[in-house]
Amino acid sequence: MPNVFQNLVSCKRVFRELKMAAYNGGTSAAAAGHHHHHHHHLPHLPPPHLHHHHHPQHHLHPGSAAAVHPVQQHTSSAAAAAAAAAAAAAMLNPGQQQPYFPSPAPGQAPGPAAAAPAQVQAAAAATVKAHHHQHSHHPQQQLDIEPDRPIGYGAFGVVWSVTDPRDGKRVALKKMPNVFQNLVSCKRVFRELKMLCFFKHDNVLSALDILQPPHIDYFEEIYVVTELMQSDLHKIIVSPQPLSSDHVKVFLYQILRGLKYLHSAGILHRDIKPGNLLVNSNCVLKICDFGLARVEELDESRHMTQEVVTQYYRAPEILMGSRHYSNAIDIWSVGCIFAELLGRRILFQAQSPIQQLDLITDLLGTPSLEAMRTACEGAKAHILRGPHKQPSLPVLYTLSSQATHEAVHLLCRMLVFDPSKRISAKDALAHPYLDEGRLRYHTCMCKCCFSTSTGRVYTSDFEPVTNPKFDDTFEKNLSSVRQVKEIIHQFILEQQKGNRVPLCINPQSAAFKSFISSTVAQPSEMPPSPLVWE
């Protein structure tokens, strides 16, 4: 273990690793090696089956129902527990607490961003006394939170990992910057914020907390706390890790389970892609990044924006300039991801939206006029000018040995050109291909079922929906930036009523200054502009 004593962060990490190795040594040397691996590579996908609950050496996700196994609680150091309690009481900097869950090594931060520089890491670990917001609402009872490293960029915001000073758990902190630039961005952020607080589903990322806003005159950014996930499907697909058919089934099951819930709420995600499917070290998957999500428009005469969906996962109706689309666009994206999980490469990897459409018709054949009824004239003309193509769907069997008859059958129901004939999330979940994924998820991964001494007690509803739907009528009455700012400010304060001690960021810390200056989405992450058909 080189460079152990470079700074406080590396010291702590190595000490934690040594203690965990010593603890895991009681179970097996292999387990210690497996743990070490966790720091330096993507989280190894453990086969998703029963032993998770029974082997403490498998890192349970901090947010999971069995967050800390009784055995683990007993063996994690009493000093750390005391420190966490003292810190919560004395409002110490959260960087000092040691949650049980190991964080990745500095320099190994997941996500496109590099780890924060060493001095920032060190600053994050240094003790900072609680800083009372001069404009805060509860100055006497507020805890500071410190960002420690960037872990990713969404469509509209930066995400850092932090430690919650109230319980020492590692969580993710999303910064929504430049919220109040104009009315459009205000509305979009308010919609995303309301969605994050509305969602109550294990396969959809939701807000655990929102940081205390300053006085309204100083209110420019919003910080949302969510569960911290170790990886995402993009990192897993491009990694050398083998993916068993069990993994594919359990991932696809969870994507569709989350999507059925979103669609039941009347929400279109509009940017389903592997990078927006977060995965923790137990293979639990959550759909995230609702920066582009919106409520489904049932009035066909109302136009919808085409600034959606990363190109490779973009449904043909959007590529063809349709002004009205349904939640079937999300199912198309899932079909592309399903094929990518099987073949470990992007299914339709085109250089431009026109080429994207051409690759789709190469596979599906030339669509009928009926299937193109919502397309704009220029797009139809492009298809009709070209040669007539026959479908070549059997090529999907060559994706991998896991592309079985059942897998390809379900895939072909998702990759249908005509959105009205594409399978729904609800019907896809009833497909026999997903039976094993459902069983695996509910026997050892979910929070909705539980084990007793006599066996497993299953929930009455494996794939729940939401009632009532998400209501976006609040947007109709938003007319000025100042008005929305006041409404959002009030909304955040209401979310915190009766909640735990409010959290705020310590603006004096170096890590915070780095977080503040971190940029929004990298250019490559932004969805490309839509094609303008002549």
From Swiss-Prot:
Residues 33-61, 129-138 have a biased composition (Basic residues). Its EC number is 2.7.11.24. Residues 8-311, 441-534 are annotated as: Required for interaction with TAB2. Phosphorylated on Thr-305. Intermolecular autophosphorylation on Thr-305 activates the enzyme. GO terms for molecular function: ATP binding; MAP kinase activity; metal ion binding; protein serine kinase activity; protein serine/threonine kinase activity. It is found in: Nucleus; Cytoplasm. Residues 8-132, 131-423 are annotated as: Sufficient for interaction with DAPK3. ATP binds at I151, G152, Y153, G154, A155, F156, G157, V158, V159, K174. A motif (TQE) lies at residues 305-307. Activated by the non-canonical Wnt signaling pathway, in which WNT5A leads to activation of MAP3K7/TAK1 and HIPK2, which subsequently phosphorylates and activates this protein. Activated by dimerization and subsequent intermolecular autophosphorylation on Thr-305. Other cytokines such as IL6 may also activate this regulatory circuit. The modification Phosphoserine is found at S529. The active site is at D271 (proton acceptor). Contains a TQE activation loop motif in which autophosphorylation of the threonine residue (Thr-305) is sufficient for kinase activation. This mode of activation contrasts with that of classical MAP kinases, which contain a TXY activation loop motif in which phosphorylation of both the threonine and tyrosine residues is required for kinase activation. Serine/threonine-protein kinase that regulates a number of transcription factors with key roles in cell fate determination. Positive effector of the non-canonical Wnt signaling pathway, acting downstream of WNT5A, MAP3K7/TAK1 and HIPK2. Negative regulator of the canonical Wnt/beta-catenin signaling pathway. Binds to and phosphorylates TCF7L2/TCF4 and LEF1, promoting the dissociation of the TCF7L2/LEF1/beta-catenin complex from DNA, as well as the ubiquitination and subsequent proteolysis of LEF1. This is Serine/threonine-protein kinase NLK. It comes from Bos taurus (Bovine). The gene is NLK.
